[in-house]
Amino acid sequence: MAAASFYGTGKRKSSIARVWLKPGTGVITVNHKTLDEYFGRETSKMVVKQPLELTENLGKFDIYVTVSGGGDSGQAGAIKHGITKALLEVDAALRTPLKKAGFVTRDSRIKERKKYGKKSARASFQFSKR
């Protein structure tokens, strides 16, 4: 741990998170707010903390995050991906447990585009025979 801070970029759906890890007491700041203030849902908070709990680093780093785009779920996933990438910068040996849990792989599922002649991506307009 020679560097003062470790950086990771995470993406999920249309959200992009930039994450900085700094050795500290475990304070997580998202867009200048605490984690509890930023995310109302408990599931989003749990998703953000998953890589830290898995690697037993929950109280060891102060985490500063800037996240933009998407909704709560996408932003939480982007932060999780960013924290994972930053943890890999801290210690490359953490790659095996994080990869096994599926945190290293970027979730590439994004919104399907709307097609012309259709109501949405797949739903057609109501069809009438007569």
Swiss-Prot record:
The keyword Ribosomal protein applies. GO terms for molecular function: RNA binding; structural constituent of ribosome. InterPro entries: Ribosomal_Su5_D2-typ_SF, Ribosomal_uS9, Ribosomal_uS9_bac/plastid, Ribosomal_uS9_CS, Ribsml_uS5_D2-typ_fold_subgr. Keywords: Ribonucleoprotein, Ribosomal protein. The keyword Iron-sulfur does not apply. GO terms for biological process: translation. Pfam families: Ribosomal_S9 (PF00380). One of its GO terms (cellular component) is cytosolic small ribosomal subunit. Signal peptide: none annotated. PROSITE patterns: RIBOSOMAL_S9. NCBIfam families: PRK00132.1. Belongs to the universal ribosomal protein uS9 family. This is Small ribosomal subunit protein uS9. The gene is rpsI.
